[in-house]
Amino acid sequence: MARRLLLSFLLPLLLLASPALRAAGLSVGLAADVSSLDPHYLNAAPNIAVASHFFETLVAVDKDGQLVPGLAQSWQAINPTTWEFKLRPGVKFHDGSPLTAEDVAFSLDRPASLTQSPGPFTGFTRAISGKKVVDAHTLRLTTAQPYGPLPLDLASIFIVSKKAAAQATTEDFNSGKALVGTGPFRLVKFRRGEAVELARFDGYWGEKPAWDTLTLRILPADAARLAALLAGQVDMIEGVPGTDVARLKKDARFRL
């Protein structure tokens, strides 16, 4: 996975210490806290950004805002109220089990079950009135009336393992017990309010990440985040303080 894609969740202003390009591991200072690793619990940008390293969606959105294949290699409206999605073959979860249409159907149902969510994802699944698993790699979704934006909505719902998450709570995701996705990284450890530690998933179906490990340090204070970069404690930060941009542009150690 290219560096730009891997870190696409970060804000436009980035500083990267040059040696990090050659390192086996990358450490990033985040500007916002991550409240949960449950991908269906809270519809908030910091949580979604981190979840995107572990989980993927049926449909993706490219840098130009166009819909492109994700876990679904194709989709089509077979009548005004029915959409058919064909899953990408050969995709594995972090536990080695294959991705199936049953996992997708379960994942689309799950947001509605999280009744205590402070920011639910149900707005992206509300239009779906029915689901039919045709075979292991084919899922049909029906809507009560014609609904063209459905593929775009599905770009916001992460797919989880039904086996791992069927009886799981949000805390089971935070502990790592239920955190089984298809993404390029797997969870090593979540230290709430401090850091998220990740390791490359070698069974990933797509382009492999450039680094073996990724550490996301939670550093909401601008001064602390910048100090960590200058001290070599992190390789990259998001949210570079505007007052420091001009000075840092002149520092050959970093790229802005």
Which positions does each model-derived feature cover?
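Extracellular/periplasmic solute-recognition and catalytic clefts
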Residues: 131, 188-199, 215-256
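Bacterial N-terminal signal peptides
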Residues: 8-17
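N-terminal lobe/hinge region of extracytoplasmic solute-binding protein
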Residues: 29-79, 109, 178-181
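Surface-exposed binding/hinge segments that line
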Residues: 76, 122-165
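Short, well-ordered beta-strand elements
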Residues: 24-33, 73, 82-85, 104-108, ...
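Aromatic- and charge-enriched surface segment that lines or borders ligand/interaction sites
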Residues: 74-117, 140, 225-228
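Alpha-to-beta junction loops
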Residues: 26, 104, 137-139, 146, ...
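Gly/Pro-rich hinge or "lid" segments in bacterial periplasmic/extracellular proteins
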Residues: 66, 155-209, 213, 223, ...
